[in-house]
Amino acid sequence: MKIFLDTANLNDIKAGVSLGVVDGVTTNPSLVAKEGVSLENRINQIAEICNGPISAEVIADKRDEMVAEAEELTKISPNIVVKIPLTQDGLQATKVLSEKNINTNLTLVFSLNQAILAAKAGATYVSPFVGRVDDIGGNGMQLVEEIVTTFNQYAINTEVIAASIRHPRHVTEAARIGCDIVTIPKAVLEKMVNHPLTDKGIEKFMEDWHKNKQK
């Protein structure tokens, strides 16, 4: 399973990449806005840090404008994946872009039906939002499992990115069901690294080591 970082913060990306476990980055307009920079500048900066796929989302909401914006985004770096919301115009734009061999990530996916349509339109990736489904009383990981199972059944090449990940348990469940990718904030990555028993084990090893040296 691949791990993407869901952030537009350069320090977070540098920290994640330095661990040697980050395969790509996903951003959205809200994350970029928090950084107070233009999308083009920030994506350029991210591309200098991360060699993997970088999802950058279009702002337009009509097919032709989405396509035009996507074509401009792909000029920034060969690693750009154009992130498109799953709407009727988004599906139409995805079909056009797939025929131009431009990679797309269909985002804001909340049902298996939406995921199927994204794949039919030629999406490279589809991003079901786990946490947001949970927020309305649904089961986000069950949705991911349904998508993964269906895509496997029909040998669909579209990769599934479990998004809106809130805690390490989501990552564990995604791995167990065979999800292709999880995209996570830095806080979740840090929680995946840390474990109290690891810390206690290190303390015990060091304590025994120093005792032995004093003999």
From Swiss-Prot:
GO terms of molecular function: aldehyde-lyase activity; transaldolase activity
Pfam families on file: TAL_FSA
Active site residues of this protein: K83
Keyword annotations of the record: Cytoplasm, Pentose shunt, Schiff base, Transferase
Gene Ontology, cellular component aspect: cytoplasm
Class of enzymatic activity (EC top level): transferase
Keyword Nuclease: no
TM region positions: none
Cell compartment(s), UniProt: Cytoplasm
Catalytic activity: D-sedoheptulose 7-phosphate + D-glyceraldehyde 3-phosphate = D-erythrose 4-phosphate + beta-D-fructose 6-phosphate
Pathway: Carbohydrate degradation; pentose phosphate pathway; D-glyceraldehyde 3-phosphate and beta-D-fructose 6-phosphate from D-ribose 5-phosphate and D-xylulose 5-phosphate (non-oxidative stage): step 2/3
Keyword Cytoplasm: yes
GO biological processes: carbohydrate metabolic process; pentose-phosphate shunt
HAMAP family, per database record: Transaldolase_3b
Known role: Transaldolase is important for the balance of metabolites in the pentose-phosphate pathway.
Family: Belongs to the transaldolase family. Type 3B subfamily.
PANTHER family, per the entry: FRUCTOSE-6-PHOSPHATE ALDOLASE 1-RELATED, TRANSALDOLASE
Protein name: Probable transaldolase
Species the sequence originates in: Natranaerobius thermophilus (strain ATCC BAA-1301 / DSM 18059 / JW/NM-WN-LF)
Lineage, opening ranks: Bacteria, Bacillati, Bacillota, Clostridia, Natranaerobiales
Name of the gene this protein is made from: tal
